[in-house]
């Protein structure tokens, strides 16, 4: 009705992780409407135990994004809604960089990890989108190589202080092909 193409949600909603049954109708409606969902970290876990060095923003935010991705995957949200368009801000946080560990845990302890979804978590990399703001050219290259150039889009984190000061500089620094940049 409003012509909006998508919405932004936090990495969790209050005390609910993104696999909470109370949130499924929201994700289902977004999927049916073809609306995109940007997941941005907030209210970082462990904040009380990290009072110094801006640690909630430096290490808590990446962990929040991994938490969100794992809940969407392990909770079966992405399995039940294969057309759901989800983009994880900050390059997916630590999720793409720990997918090997996550997959290993899935394979070694399915009794704990695969309780609500028996599908390998790595399979969902092709279903998720990631923004490009990772603050490191090598990390961006890894993200592109791991998730695919068609799954990574420009991200700046504007207007927050950790955002990319020159939008697109990270992508431009990689000397990607014109086709990859266009994606």
Model-derived features: where do they sit?
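Distinct, well-ordered alpha-helical segments
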Residues: 1, 19-23, 99-103, 139-144
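Active-site environment of divalent metal-dependent phosphoester hydrolases
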Residues: 14-15, 43-49, 81, 93-97, ...
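Active-site gating/metal-coordination segments in enzymes
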Residues: 1-76
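Short, well-ordered coil/turn segments that N-cap beta-strands
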Residues: 2-7, 33-35, 82-85, 121-128, ...
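Alpha-helical packing segments of well-folded alpha/beta enzyme cores
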Residues: 1, 26, 69-73, 80, ...
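Mid-to-C-terminal alpha-helical segments outside catalytic/metal-binding sites
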Residues: 84, 94, 129-130, 134-153, ...
């Amino acid at each position: 009705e409003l012509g909006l193409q998508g919405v932004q949600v936090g990495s969790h909603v209050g005390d609910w992780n993104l696999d909470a049954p109370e949130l499924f109708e929201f994700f289902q409606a977004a999927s049916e409407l073809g609306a995109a969902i940007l997941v941005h970290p907030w209210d970082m876990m462990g904040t009380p135990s990290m009072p110094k060095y801006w640690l909630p923003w430096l290490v808590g935010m990446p962990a929040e994004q991994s938490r969100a991705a794992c809940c969407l995957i392990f909770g079966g949200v992405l399995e039940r809604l294969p057309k759901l368009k989800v983009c994880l801000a900050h390059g997916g946080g630590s999720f793409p960089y720990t997918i090997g560990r996550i997959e290993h845990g899935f394979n070694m302890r399915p009794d704990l990890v695969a309780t609500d979804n028996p599908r390998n978590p790595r399979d969902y990399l092709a279903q998720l989108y990631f923004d490009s703001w990772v603050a490191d050219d090598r990390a961006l290259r890894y993200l592109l190589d791991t998730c695919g150039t068609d799954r990574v889009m420009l991200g700046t984190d504007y207007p927050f202080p950790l955002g990319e000061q020159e939008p697109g500089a990270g992508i431009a620094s990689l000397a990607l092909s014109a086709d990859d940049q266009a994606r």
